[in-house]
Amino acid sequence: MQGISVTGLVKRGWMVRSVFDTIDGIDQLGEQLASVTVTLDKLAAIQPQLVALLPDEIASQQINRELALANYATMSGIYAQTAALIENAAAMGQAFDAAKNDDSFYLPPEAFDNPDFQRGLKLFLSADGKAARMIISHEGDPATPEGISHIDAIKQAAHEAVKGTPMAGAGIYLAGTAATFKDIQDGATYDLLIAGIAALSLILLIMMIITRSLVAALVIVGTVALSLGASFGLSVLVWQHLLGIQLYWIVLALAVILLLAVGSDYNLLLISRFKEEIGAGLNTGIIRAMAGTGGVVTAAGLVFAATMSSFVFSDLRVLGQIGTTIGLGLLFDTLVVRAFMTPSIAVLLGRWFWWPQRVRPRPASRMLRPYGPRPVVRELLLREGNDDPRTQVATHR
């Protein structure tokens, strides 16, 4: 009972403490309300002054409203006038566009009486008034690859500018340094293409007539074209990549002419010797032909190459470039094409090298082959009315 009474007393103490805390909170709330009351008293004192200002503020806002309405009325009229002006301008623009008045301009008659104007008119307009001249200035040197490259862009821009105008079908021509060099370059390229195709076609025809073989003629032309490409590649490597000097445009044209002539000539000589020795068999005939004339053809090619290469010591750089290009082409043609490629192609093709001729891949039988020294045999074979060459050879022996 004593323990229960102590617990009850503790609980009652806590309850009393809670009541006192609540009373303290009410006191604090009262203090805060007192400060709010002070603020409200100050606001109540100011409120009559604010109320007194409201009529003036209302009057000011009414004035602003009237100004806004007046501004709106003014701008409405301006907007209507602007729309009318735009409509008129659009109609006038369409009319001017339909009339194409912008394609010309007006000059007063007095301008044509001016001596200075007449002098300039002769420079920029033709006598009949159907041609006009314009002066274009390059940013760089026109006599350079960069200046020449501007020609196509200028022509394209001029053609684009006259599209949709009465001058759409007019001819546009360019003159000057860059245009002249561009015409020379295009003409040289076109002429070189024609000359190369015509020369190769003519060489092919002549080789077919002489060798009587389509394949052999194609081999000659193909190896000559290969020598041309190799000579130009080696020349570009030496002059432009190693020495840093651009090749002149005429080097290509002159090198083509000489290399076509010399290359086809030497190849024809070698293949003609193949044909002369074909009676001994294809491979044996090639070996004999190379042994008999290979050294002569090689020596001739080396001498010609050395002669042309000596142009490099000339004071004229273009002669040095022409000589070295031809010399490099002859060296490649002599040491690679005629010494290795042409005999190798003939061996690989075999009897098809002489197509459409029919040749024996091996030597003829002893019963079908004449005997005796070569000059005597050739003389007897070419003699007309020869019935039995072997009997005639025996009499010569």
UniProtKB/Swiss-Prot annotation:
- Transmembrane feature ranges: 190-210, 214-234, 242-262, 293-313, 328-348
Q: Name one GO cellular component term.
A: plasma membrane
Which of UniProt's keywords are assigned here? Cell membrane, Membrane, Transmembrane, Transmembrane helix, Transport
Instruction: Report if keyword Transmembrane helix is assigned.
Output: yes
Q: Does the keyword Cytoplasm apply?
A: no
Q: What is its main location?
A: membrane
Q: Which domain of life is it from?
A: Bacteria
Give the subcellular location: Cell membrane
Q: What membrane topology is annotated for this entry?
A: Multi-pass membrane protein
Record PANTHER family: MEMBRANE PROTEIN MJ1562-RELATED, MEMBRANE PROTEIN YDGH-RELATED
Entry similarity comment: Belongs to the resistance-nodulation-cell division (RND) (TC 2.A.6) family. MmpL subfamily.
Q: Under which name does UniProt file this protein?
A: Probable transport protein MmpL6
Give the source lineage, highest ranks first. Answer: Bacteria, Bacillati, Actinomycetota, Actinomycetes, Mycobacteriales
The record's gene field reads mmpL6
